[in-house]
Amino acid sequence: MTSRNQQLFERAQRHIPGGVNSPVRAFRSVGGTPCFFQKGVGAKVQDADGKWYTDYVGSWGPMILGHAHPDVIAAVQAAVVDGLSFGAPTEKEVDIADLLCELVPSMDMVRLVSSGTEATMSAIRLARGHTGRDVLIKFEGCYHGHSDGLLVKAGSGLLTFGNPSSSGVPAGTAETTMVLTYNDPQELADAFAKHGDKIAAVIVEPVVGNMNLIAPTQAFLNAMRDLCTKNGSVLIFDEVMTGFRVGLKSAQGLFGITPDLSTFGKVVGGGMPLGAFGGKREIMEKIAPLGPVYQAGTLSGNPIATAAGLATLKLIQAPGFYEALTAKTKALCDGLVAAAKKHGVAFSAQNIGGMFGLYFAEQCPGTYDEVLACDKEAFNRFFHAMLDAGHYFAPSAFEAGFVSAAHSDADIAGTIAAADAYFASLK
């Protein structure tokens, strides 16, 4: 009998390209039929066939409290009855701006938007407007949203400018983006030595979550900050994924680096569409209506999204919240590694706060090339075995995973036991 998931997927493909509204959801990387989810409670999600899973995707990061947290739901319900959107200032957007600037010391001012892509796109435009320069440096394997200038792959040689990695991106747009190797401070220094007076900004995921999880070296982050300062370039931390996920002060607080601009999404909206970018006052005052850099949005600062975001940001400030989140995420990683080792499976894992990476390799990778060398087919088999057992991981070997405050010790233990059984079956 055809499953409800399969029926929905077949129907979806009639009017939605690929049957999904974001490519990774189609399961093209791992194969099979995607899950259509209809309900989430705590650490669990239920698909259209009624099957429940322990969820390690968490809507790709926002659900740090788990699904349908009662305080967040109550805040949204209370806001909805007062109106869905005004296209005008509201008190809630002032409240969340105050709170964001309090929690992120590098931000003197902040502008709300509706997505992480909007946040990074706007921050880059602002950096170019502030410096009067055009060139942007990004790093291979880092994802900053789907705006044209960021859908770029590396050129053919060291310090070359980029080429489009998506159809529809003009070559001229990509040519103002330089793609370098993540965690290579010398290559970054060489780029500044050659092009320093043209570089408007460096944008980076301080912890990479879009080529699985890659931790930065402190030397790399320090070099980035020093080189931007010396050359008058803007350092942009893309904290859309890491913001309030790796710690209350985000990645910049964890690693002790002060960026000039920061972008946020995911956790700040508590599951609703909300993003933000902010930073130094002298840069932020270049944005319209104060300055010449234009940025706008009909739904920016939406009162329902800000209600969810405020409720979430208040709850994550509870004493011990991040210590507990980090401990349970580490317990998951350590347990999976121990299970794999027991059965002779090449496997490694690591976490930073509530983010984690799983790799079918002897050691955790530190670069994009090392990620590509991991055994993707082994991951795909693991993914489907765990899905069958009721444990939902990201449907791609190149995506980080997430643990929420709602995950219990029993949830973690159950996932480790399922992995142990799968690894044992490989003998």
UniProtKB/Swiss-Prot annotation:
The modification N6-(pyridoxal phosphate)lysine is found at K266. Pathway: Porphyrin-containing compound metabolism; protoporphyrin-IX biosynthesis; 5-aminolevulinate from L-glutamyl-tRNA(Glu): step 2/2. The keyword Glycoprotein does not apply. Its EC number is 5.4.3.8. GO terms for cellular component: cytoplasm. Its cofactor is pyridoxal 5'-phosphate. PROSITE patterns: AA_TRANSFER_CLASS_3 (PS00600). This is Glutamate-1-semialdehyde 2,1-aminomutase.
